[in-house]
Amino acid sequence: MYVIMDRALPFIGDGLKPVQRRIVYAMSELGLNASAKFKKSARTVGDVLGKYHPHGDSACYEAMVLMAQPFSYRYPLVDGQGNWGAPDDPKSFAAMRYTESRLSKYSELL
């Protein structure tokens, strides 16, 4: 049972994978709620990597991109500014140094 709890499977309580939960938590700790100013995505990814998720930055940023794309999630958890991809090519997002983000109104409900 312990192995299943630490896997990258969505939790039944909120539907988030561990990396997604860490991104939302780190953004809330940075004060990036829905009414705050946008902050560079590289800052958020660096904070997540340094404190909570010691894996590659591309995996963390791709998880954040999926949470920001309105065509990937029914209720996007991240409000993004910049090039976050297109519905016909979702992998065409810009590098994290060119995008900015904050939490959406939906993520404040978590």
Swiss-Prot record:
Residues 9-110 form the Topo IIA-type catalytic domain. GO terms for molecular function: ATP binding; DNA binding; DNA topoisomerase type II (double strand cut, ATP-hydrolyzing) activity. Its main location: membrane. Keywords: Cell membrane, DNA-binding, Isomerase, Membrane, Topoisomerase. It is an enzyme of class 5 (isomerase). It is found in: Cell membrane. Disulfide bonds: none annotated. The record marks R97 as: Transition state stabilizer. It comes from the Bacteria. PROSITE patterns: TOPO_IIA. InterPro entries: Topo_IIA-like_dom_sf (IPR013760), Topo_IIA_A/C_ab (IPR013758), Topo_IIA_dom_A (IPR002205), Type_II_DNA_Topoisomerases (IPR050220). GO terms for cellular component: cytoplasm; DNA topoisomerase type II (double strand cut, ATP-hydrolyzing) complex; plasma membrane. The record marks K17, H53, H55 as: Interaction with DNA. Heterotetramer composed of ParC and ParE. Belongs to the type II topoisomerase GyrA/ParC subunit family. ParC type 1 subfamily. Topoisomerase IV is essential for chromosome segregation. It relaxes supercoiled DNA. Performs the decatenation events required during the replication of a circular DNA molecule. This is DNA topoisomerase 4 subunit A. The gene is parC.
